[in-house]
Amino acid sequence: MNLAIIGYGKMGKTIEQVALDRGHTVVARIDNPNFTPAEIAHADVAIEFTQPDSAKENILKCFEANIPVAVGTTAWYEDYDAVAEIAKAEGKALFTATNFSIGVNILFHLNKQLAAVMNNFDEYNVTMTETHHLEKKDHPSGTAVTLAEGILAQLDRKKKYIGLLKGQSADISAFDLHIESKREPNVPGDHTITYSSEIDDITIRHTAKSRMGFAKGAVIAAEWLIGKKGVFGMNDLLNF
């Protein structure tokens, strides 16, 4: 496939490496937010990894260029419903994921199942920690938010999540799911969910060893998206 990469930072360069290794051609490398749809129109599909304030405009440029787009940018989801409606109404293809890693999406699946089981055991309190590299600006991470939403959907005793950077404090009630965010050098991503009681802990965790898992998942999603119309996510790709 002919691929346009929108966002040519560390992740974009890793995506390029994976795409080339899988026999694809990168026909556009976009690192300027003022690019035009014409610059990507010759691609079969685009992968977008930029910043939250650029994502919506970048997606709409892909729609204007009439190419499918797989979006890995997070923290732009206040615009998601409007963008998804445009995709459906105009017959475009939009694939979004808070995390393209296959392993993380397995964690999403296990997380929901565990929360459903733990709904019957009130003696356990659930908390979450997420750690990323210093360059990651948003917190909690999109992955942590997806995990939190999975827990809240299954665990009746938690009503909302509260995300705090390490060292921050806030009033956290028994009804709140506390997410602690840490920013440390050279950490691609680590997410841990712990159910703790007076007698034991139950923990599930995903630790990324590099950006390669995210990049490979994004390229696989882009391959899958070609020729489709509509709005999709990792559950569609993985048949969860």
Where are these regions (language model features)?
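C-terminal substrate-binding/catalytic lobe of Rossmann-fold NAD(P)-dependent oxidoreductases
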Residues: 2, 10-38, 120-240
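Short acidic/histidine-rich motifs immediately flanking catalytic phosphotransfer sites
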Residues: 40-47, 63-68
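Rossmann-fold NAD(P) dinucleotide-binding segment
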Residues: 52-72, 80-83
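Rossmann-fold dehydrogenase core element
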Residues: 68, 83-101, 118-124, 128
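Rossmann-fold NAD(P)-binding glycine/threonine-rich loop
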Residues: 73-94, 105-116
